[in-house]
Amino acid sequence: MLGVGAGYLEAEFRAVGASFAQRGAVTDEYLGAMQTLWYDEHPEYHGRFADFAGVDGRPRPLQRPIPLVVAGHSAPAYRRAVAWAHGWYGYWLTADNVAASLTGLRAAADRVDRPAALGELEISVTPRGPVTPGQAAAFAEAGVHRLVFLAPQTPDGPAQTIDAAITTVAGL
């Protein structure tokens, strides 16, 4: 699985001399260029931000296709997820506010042709804080396929997060 996001912190772009304003266009083009490198026997790509021919990207990924997941809470991110990805990832959401993102994804699906090979768009969310069994059920009812729990950055954080997830799932 490969997670892709265009970024949202302008200072990070300044730090590496990249254009914040063009981040979406660059991301879209790089997705096309990467797929050419991964899947084409003789990869060639000519775009505004990536331009190559006579190269080969090896080793190639064993899993074909690579499951792409696009992150973001904007109309361009929703469009990118529908057009390119197997899944969409939302960060720090509640069961209540995930609905706005799902509405945005449906609107993008009405405007963008989704390749049939991608199948149904899988929805993954990192919830805001601990989740009760009732909240997990509400996420599922809203259309979320997967919850990704964020462990606190403490020595016991991962174990506590796993224990909480087990308790949540056991309560469903």
Predicted feature descriptions by range:
Residues 1-172:
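Active-site-adjacent structural elements that line small-molecule/cofactor binding pockets in enzymes
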